[in-house]
A protein has these predicted regions:
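An active-site-proximal beta-strand-loop segment
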Residues: 2-30, 36
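Catalytic cores and conserved motifs of cyclic dinucleotide signaling enzymes
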Residues: 13-14, 73-75
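Active-site beta-loop-alpha junctions of metal-dependent nucleic acid enzymes
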Residues: 14, 32-57
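Acidic/histidine-rich, metal-coordinating catalytic segments
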Residues: 57-73, 92, 147-148
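RNase H-like polynucleotidyl transferase catalytic core
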Residues: 63-68, 82-100, 117-119
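C-terminal domain-tail junction helix/linker
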Residues: 75, 79-86, 110-158
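Short amphipathic alpha-helical "interface-anchor" segments enriched in bulky aromatics
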Residues: 101-110
Length: 158
């Protein structure tokens, strides 16, 4: 599993932040959370959404990989990761290539989602929720044998 946070700009220069957890095997976004700030809660809430994902059965040796940002080195975050039964891995300091698939997702996301028309954080959240549904269930990917992430997951477990 991969996790990271990206900043988002919307109408009149307002900022929002998106935290995601991505399955690196299927490219499925398993959990995401949007906030208007970068407090620790953004990653803790993302972990809570991962925990409540009813379609998910985590492997006993699953690893959650991130950069070495302050959120991911926080003892509170690390404890919550451990409580989920995950092992934690972090990129080498200052090396974005270690989390390249997650960074790539954010790049595609920013190319495909137009948030400049959103006036409120609630509108941003709705756009992002709609995109995550589209990305996981309708957006075919060449590297997944031309399947969507959910189709590919189902293919792997069948």
């Amino acid at each position: 599993l991969l996790t990271d946070i990206t900043y988002l700009s919307y109408k009149n220069g307002k900022k929002a932040y998106l935290s995601t957890i991505k399955d690196s095997s299927t490219n499925e976004i398993l959990a995401h959370y949007v906030s208007d700030n970068l407090r620790l809660d953004i990653v803790l809430n993302t972990l809570e959404k991962l925990k409540s994902n009813v379609n998910l059965k985590l492997h006993s040796e699953a690893i959650l990989h991130s950069d070495q940002g302050v959120h991911y080195t926080s003892p509170k975050f690390q404890k919550q990761v451990q409580q989920l039964g995950l092992k934690q891995s972090m990129s080498r300091r200052g090396n974005c290539w270690d989390n390249a698939p997650q960074e790539s997702f954010f790049g595609h996301f920013k190319d495909e989602v137009i948030l400049s028309k959103c006036s409120t954080l609630e509108e941003v959240i709705k756009e992002i929720d709609d995109y995550m549904d589209y990305y996981n269930n309708y957006r075919y990917q060449w590297n997944l044998s031309k399947m969507t992430p959910v189709q590919y997951r189902n293919h792997l477990v069948s």
